[in-house]
């Protein structure tokens, strides 16, 4: 990670860390790096989620883009994967999404996509960072006809919805689907998509007001949708995050079906159809041990990466794999889109239900999970957790006690000032005890003093 760019673009508290001034400079520097070889007036798409700070940052970013001669097409509120798809579909030179995904409303972020719809490489981000840190801005400052322009392309939402419908062979007639849009970017997309697929719909978290994104709803709060599914007697529930690149499912009896299980279900189905490239799925080190045991029983190969959907996508492209993702709900179907896509993943999952005639609880039960606990600890300097001798000592002690029947993962978050402690063990009691033992040391050594 660089000075400005984390694992998912530039993020920070809006108007104090991620300021309009920084957004303007990101527009100038990022726009220049991504379009300098394109020719006169390259086209860049700009979109945002529903945060109150979105319009402020959008205005500043667009000003920066226009100042280096870029033609901006403004998409309005749309999901991150919608932007990625439309970048290629519209032949744009690049695109920018303004969102902090699942983070609280005070945060916001800016992430770029290249003309191929993929997130930027480390080299591209490093070049933008070098320009940001240059004492004097010497980039072109055209005038008159050399300036860029701004136009709206709000109909891009419908084009994206129509594309998603083409990725499956079934409609959803006869299914009652509960949707939780996290008061975010899928609020204006999900109900239209599933209505077009002839499903019966109940929705929550679909009334954004600028302040309620991810607030007790969405993929980071699946318990809200679980209660909603039971109340509405739905066949399945889908909870998206603020920018729509994640999904967590709920089965008909209110159980959470996380990204691991969704990937497992879809991998099994794709393999049966002869559609799983190289008989391999890509996941991160956060996936449950039960996920890997289940894949082994199915004789499906797996490739593990560091945490972050960008690393999953990199491995998928390198190995020509078409399915990968994260336990958190970032799932990439590379045959259909270039990034995690909650809506796409949701319809692929329900398509498997329709094709097999099985309930989601039946499909999910085919993968057994190890008890797992995750603690997020706010710290003063997340990057030194692996260097702390007391933290290393307690991890070693726990791993020795596990004797191979479990695992520990302690790592810095790529997007927030947190250390994440994840433990899996044979029983829930052991998992809780080991996780608390390690977390206590991390808190003692590194936690912020409130």
Curated annotation (Swiss-Prot):
CDD domains: GlmM. One of its GO terms (cellular component) is cytosol. This is Phosphoglucosamine mutase. It comes from Listeria monocytogenes serotype 4b (strain F2365). Transmembrane segments: none annotated. Keywords: Isomerase, Magnesium, Metal-binding, Phosphoprotein. Its EC number is 5.4.2.10. Disulfide bonds: none annotated. The active site is at residue 101. The keyword Metal-binding applies. Belongs to the phosphohexose mutase family. NCBIfam families: glmM, PRK10887.1. Mg(2+) binds at residues 101, 241, 243, 245. HAMAP family: GlmM_B. InterPro entries: A-D-PHexomutase_a/b/a-I (IPR005844), A-D-PHexomutase_a/b/a-I/II/III (IPR016055), A-D-PHexomutase_a/b/a-II (IPR005845), A-D-PHexomutase_a/b/a-III (IPR005846), A-D-PHexomutase_C (IPR005843), A-D-PHexomutase_C_sf (IPR036900), A-D-PHexomutase_CS (IPR016066), Alpha-D-phosphohexomutase_SF (IPR005841). It is an enzyme of class 5 (isomerase). Binds 1 Mg(2+) ion per subunit. GO terms for molecular function: magnesium ion binding; phosphoglucosamine mutase activity; phosphomannomutase activity. GO terms for biological process: carbohydrate metabolic process; peptidoglycan biosynthetic process; UDP-N-acetylglucosamine biosynthetic process. Pfam families: PGM_PMM_I, PGM_PMM_II, PGM_PMM_III, PGM_PMM_IV. Activated by phosphorylation. It catalyses: alpha-D-glucosamine 1-phosphate = D-glucosamine 6-phosphate. The modification Phosphoserine is found at residue 101. Its cofactor is Mg(2+). Catalyzes the conversion of glucosamine-6-phosphate to glucosamine-1-phosphate.
